[in-house]
Amino acid sequence: PFGVLSEYLEVPGGTYTIEVVAAGADPADGAVIGPVDLDFASGTTTTVAATNNLENIEAQVLDDAPMPAGDTAQVRVVHFSADAPAVDIAPDGGDALITDLSYPNDTDYINLPGGKYDLEIRPAGSMDVAFDIPEITLTDGVSYSVFAIGSLADDSFTVLPAVDAAVAGVRVGHFSADAPNVDVYANGGAILEDVPFGALSDYLFVPAGTYTIEVVAAGADPADGAVIGPVDLDFDGGTLTTVAATNELAEITPVEINDKRVKPAAEGAKVRVVHLSANAPKVDIAPDGSKRNEAIFKNLKFGQSKGYTKVPAGEVDLDIRAAGERAK
């Protein structure tokens, strides 16, 4: 029925021919919308909406948030009411958060602290309230879309808040020095190809869930055997994770690292060090030429990461020393 937004449907990436028909009708007798070809890339989340009145019905395609802000909620507003004018969105009686939003556009996501919000819709540039949005509760680390839908002409205009898909950010590092270039597969599909030693991918944003990961020599068929895997890894919504191939090829080991979201330092920078050299001893990380007790990170062993530490901004020369060793 009108006003319904489905749950996300998980489908393989690719091109899909979409048709919308009256309930119970045969597509061969004619579609309300379509057939239309839509491309959905792997690892993305998309909303497809039917808008406008029946005579002028059209399909709108929205790219949903790739990743929510970790310490706030993330919200966008979507104007899908074809006969409604351009509008401003504001807290009850307050200054507008969003201005001059017109059909069929959507805003960028804006970050808001979690909590309860009373919002109102006003004609663009006016303080007059056209519609009071029922109280919305936002949770930190979650992305939301607020859809303005329906028609002013038949009084079907309403607002539909919705939670966007939970998304995880994952990046992959090849840190096994004697392993060949590799391809990385997730749930049977290649996500990275011909990855050399020392490479760290950008974050890949994927729907939260469990993924079966396999790493094979570049160009090889996973059916012929994997360098790593198959192994099932869980990625929760709103998280960032680094998955690294470490150790020598004969004992290659995947390591998962939780990439915590941290607020940037007011002054300076924040740095984390991860020890992923399997045959290296425990180490200290220190400014070049500094004393033993001036090490920034101490006694770091293989597979261990030290939390983000504030350091001065600018170029810094660092030494890696055996744990407890003096500068040479």
Give the positions of each predicted feature.
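Intrinsically disordered, low-complexity polar regions and short flexible loop motifs
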Residues: 1-328
